[in-house]
């Protein structure tokens, strides 16, 4: 039975990370580095820098130090105040700077900017996601 389970996981992962699936293979290293956040902050910041470079530069200028940590705090505050679904759908605003944390599939391909933004989403398939720093327990697969 264990071999069948591993094979199923491998088949799912193989499809997801194929060109047809569109997901990236990843590890839980980013989550382990910031376990107390329950978020891969490095991936989130990389996404924001790639898709919203002007906003990120403005944000960095406003921060005296640790822009990534301050960005996490702004994101966390937005989630606490507005809810995760709202932040995913509409983004959030911090000190006059609007940020998006994902882009939804456009209804048509007529808007090149919308298509480009959608293609820049970072969807990850993570095998053996360790959810606790106190033991070695893990979830077989996580989609992030």
Identify the role of each PLM range.
Residues 1-144:
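An alpha-helical interface "stripe"
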């Amino acid at each position: 039975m264990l071999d069948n389970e591993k094979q199923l996981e491998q088949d799912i992962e193989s499809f997801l990370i194929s060109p047809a699936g569109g997901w990236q293979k990843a590890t839980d290293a980013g989550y382990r580095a910031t376990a107390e956040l329950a978020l891969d902050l490095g991936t989130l910041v990389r996404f924001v820098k790639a898709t919203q470079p002007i906003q990120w530069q403005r944000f960095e200028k406003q921060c005296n130090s640790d822009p990534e940590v301050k960005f996490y705090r702004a994101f966390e505050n937005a989630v606490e105040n507005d809810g995760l679904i709202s932040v995913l759908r509409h983004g959030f605003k911090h000190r006059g700077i609007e940020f998006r944390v994902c882009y939804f599939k456009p209804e048509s391909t007529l808007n090149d900017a919308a298509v480009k933004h959608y293609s820049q989403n970072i969807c990850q398939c993570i095998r053996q996601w360790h959810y606790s720093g106190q033991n070695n327990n893990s979830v077989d697969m996580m989609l992030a």
